[in-house]
């Protein structure tokens, strides 16, 4: 009976080391403020999904890693914002670049928040009121 309990304890200890061998998520996030005036760099490392506790030597901010899991693959798409024709920024919007690995696969993407996703004035009205150079109208 003791041998079975000892074997069970050894197997229970071996399971986390097996899942700890799978790659986790390691991202370097560089964020710029409005107008690109200030820049901040953050490094985020998450343990693999199968690991319940922090892995030795791994910084694991639980809330940020949980948010990344909730958002899922959507955040790793090539770009999250769309640019509309006839829309110009007065100042550059807040933006971020995300570079690193997700579950062992390379990640490189850029995100812009705000800006021209929803223009306040329809582009047709904007073209009537504002005179664009000829090259900008054709674009």
Predicted features along the sequence, with ranges:
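N- and C-terminal low-complexity/disordered segments
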Residues: 2-139
């Amino acid at each position: 009976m003791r041998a079975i309990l000892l074997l069970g304890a050894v197997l229970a200890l071996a399971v986390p080391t097996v899942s700890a061998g799978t790659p986790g998520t390691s991202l370097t996030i560089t964020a710029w403020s409005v107008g690109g005036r200030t820049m901040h760099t953050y490094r985020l490392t998450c343990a693999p999904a199968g690991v319940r506790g922090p892995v030795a030597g791994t910084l694991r901010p639980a809330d940020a890693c949980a948010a990344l899991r909730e958002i899922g693959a959507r955040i790793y798409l090539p770009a999250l914002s769309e640019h509309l024709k006839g829309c110009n920024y007065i100042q550059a919007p807040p933006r971020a670049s995300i570079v690193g690995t997700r579950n062992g696969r390379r990640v490189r993407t850029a995100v812009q928040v705000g800006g021209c996703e929803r223009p306040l004035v329809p582009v047709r009205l904007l073209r009537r009121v504002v005179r664009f150079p000829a090259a900008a109208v054709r674009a």
